[in-house]
Amino acid sequence: MANIREIQSRINSVRDTMKITNAMYMISSSKMTQAKKKLTDTEPYFYALQGEISRILRHIPKLEHYFFDQRETTPAEERKIASIVVTADKGLAGAYNHNIVKLEEEILSRPGIHKLFIVGELGRHYFAKRGVEIDTNFQYTVQKPTMHRARDIAGVLLDQFMSGDLDEIYIVYTRMENSVQSEAEILKLLPLERSSFNEMKMPLNVYREAIDLYPSAEAVMDSIVPNYVTGMIYGCLVEAYASEHNARMMAMRAATDSAKDLIRDLSILYNRARQAAITQEITEVCSGAKAQQN
């Protein structure tokens, strides 16, 4: 009977765990839906900014601006490279955090002076233990990404880029391809690449509408680019947040399915043990009855 009680205790424990994993699945499902709606609502504005930058470059192909300065004269070993690394604040999300960390370690293996700006507690703890230089004043959570937070992050990075403290800025995040697949990705924020704005190409003999830029093209770029970078960061934060909860949903679904399988196996063991115990009791009763008859 002790064995039966032990099996029953394990079944109850697994059932309690299954309730937790199922609840976490439902919570992550709700948060992922909210994040995807945020991204859908704000994407048109930032696509419009990208279109305006492309339009300006189309009309002024030789426009010189420090946001496009590749700083080619700086040797690779002396280039100051910043990475915004977007991880989760907690685990239980499958390989989500591992994939981000692995991708950032590839950047750290490149020549240059590296500096990390970590969004998310797990990434902050991971790289701090390995002695990588981290901006300790950069304390941002990944939970419920907002435009205000993205603007603060962009402000910190833009100031350091314009002052010459940084030569390149990347963001490492997880892009959600569909409801079942996400992929860790590196996106270059600064300096801007002209080629990335050349998608809307026009033949040379096609009339190009005249545009007036006041007070100057440089001043217009000074206004548009920071908003564009802010939008890119916000989009990455929201997409990473959705990807995190998508990964957690899949992990919790797998855990729930495993719990169901374990409960089924334990139930079979429980029934066998109970049947054996009943058989043993019947055998003992029959043996006792025969002993009394003799």
Where are the regions that the model predicts?
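C-terminal beta-strand-loop-alpha-helix "lid" module of Rossmann-like NAD(P)-dependent dehydrogenases
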Residues: 1-294
